[in-house]
């Protein structure tokens, strides 16, 4: 092993969560390094980029709602700052979201969601099917009703990731384009990593932000190994020809045959359709069945989609945790912190995660809004449990 090069903060993982953590750490004056063979890759290259704190509300996730809302409120300033730091457009759109129902059961479910949103103090408006189609004329005639949520926006995750890579480089982050092979532990304290090339990288504090791979790093003691599992998602990208524009004016969501479907229109004419949710380990195969189900359900929602060119099919891995919420902050191993397990909310939670990690790296304590998401909420038995 070659001699260790040291930094104040070493971030393992160059997805959007690792990148924003490294950027914020460097802004705080820490000498910062990041290890990833392909910074800006990973789940961000597949994600749709919905900033849907309101429409993503689920029963039993009210605590996560607070973190989601805190991050959503920060997005406009975050986008302005990152745009200035990187010189790049992030594809941020305040176009709103429309969640619709195609049958009576879905309509009842949306009514329940509307009631939950109201009890939680969230703004959403119930629309009839006719009102939904007035907003989005391409919707199927069978749409029974919907929820209009003007506060749920979108961003292009690929542009976000690229901008964060540039911002990190401009802020002086040392980027090592290689794999972190093993955590180095010295006298019961995380002290760095050894890369796949045999290089030792030392650090005062180590942040494990490896997404779905966070639980795979060698050398991490079992009692602090993050309980993160991969959840496969298949996503399609289509192109809207100019003669059909505007195809959709805002993000459209629905539950079709029990599965969650979304259509996210970009300003450049791209339409993102997703996503499956599959517990299949590390498999990232795009399957005929997955593509068929997405197109079938999307056609039921927006029949005209079959006229659009299909330009890309991708599958990625979401980092799921036992309670579908992120793990943020210090672990029981001194010097090792986590920023992982964001599941379906990684893009939405990027601003608040960066702020929370910068705060804890500086003070040793999580800010109030992030305290419920300490890794220490999981006991030793929970660390090895996986959902059936």
Describe every region a protein language model picked out:
Residues 7-33:
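N-terminal Rossmann-like FAD-binding beta1-loop-alpha1 element of flavoenzymes
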Residues 17, 40, 213:
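Conserved Rossmann-like nucleotide-cofactor binding loop
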Residues 23-28, 37, 49-50, 55, ...:
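Active-site substrate-recognition segment that forms the wall
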Residues 50-131, 135, 298:
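Dinucleotide-binding Rossmann-like beta1-alpha1 core, especially the glycine-rich loop
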Residues 66-69, 100-109, 147-166, 285-289:
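Short beta-strand to alpha-helix junction loop
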Residues 147-197, 201-205:
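Helical element adjacent to the flavin cofactor pocket in flavoenzyme catalytic cores
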Residues 302-388:
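C-terminal catalytic lobe of FAD-dependent flavoproteins
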């Amino acid at each position: 092993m070659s001699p260790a090069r040291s930094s104040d903060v070493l971030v393992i993982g160059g997805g959007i969560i690792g990148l924003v953590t490294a950027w914020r750490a460097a802004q705080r004056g820490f000498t910062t390094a990041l290890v990833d063979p392909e910074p800006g890759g990973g789940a961000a290259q597949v994600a749709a980029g919905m900033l849907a704190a309101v429409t993503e509300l689920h029963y039993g996730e009210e605590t996560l709602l607070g973190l989601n809302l805190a991050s959503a409120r920060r997005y406009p300033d975050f986008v302005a700052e990152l745009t200035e730091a990187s010189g790049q457009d992030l594809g941020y759109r305040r176009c709103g979201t429309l969640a619709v129902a195609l049958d009576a059961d879905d309509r009842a479910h949306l009514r329940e969601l509307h009631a939950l949103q109201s009890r939680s103090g969230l703004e959403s408006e119930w629309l009839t099917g006719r009102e939904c189609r007035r907003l989005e004329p391409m919707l199927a005639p069978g749409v029974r009703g919907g929820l209009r949520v003007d506060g749920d926006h979108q961003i292009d995750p690929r542009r976000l990731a690229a901008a964060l890579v540039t911002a990190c480089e401009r802020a002086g982050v040392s980027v090592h384009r290689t794999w972190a092979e093993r955590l180095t532990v010295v006298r019961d304290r995380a002290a760095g990593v050894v890369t796949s090339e045999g290089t030792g990288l030392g650090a005062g504090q180590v942040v494990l932000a490896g997404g779905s791979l966070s639980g795979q790093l060698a050398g991490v003691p079992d009692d602090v190994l993050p309980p993160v599992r991969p959840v496969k998602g298949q996503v399609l990208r289509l192109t809207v020809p100019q003669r059909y524009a505007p195809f959709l004016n805002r993000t459209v969501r629905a539950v079709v045959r029990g599965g969650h479907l979304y259509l996210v229109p970009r300003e450049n004419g791209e339409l993102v359709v997703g996503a499956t949710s599959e517990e299949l380990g590390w498999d990232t195969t795009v399957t005929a069945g997955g593509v068929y189900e997405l197109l079938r359900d999307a056609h039921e929602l927006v029949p005209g989609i079959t006229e659009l060119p299909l330009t890309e099919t991708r599958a990625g891995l979401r980092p799921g945790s036992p309670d579908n919420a992120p793990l943020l902050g210090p672990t029981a191993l001194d010097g090792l912190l986590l920023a992982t397990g964001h599941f379906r909310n990684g893009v939405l939670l990027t601003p608040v995660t960066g702020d929370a990690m910068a705060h804890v790296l500086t003070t040793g304590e999580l800010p109030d809004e992030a305290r419920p998401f300490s890794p220490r909420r999981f006991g030793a038995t929970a660390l090895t449990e996986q959902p059936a």
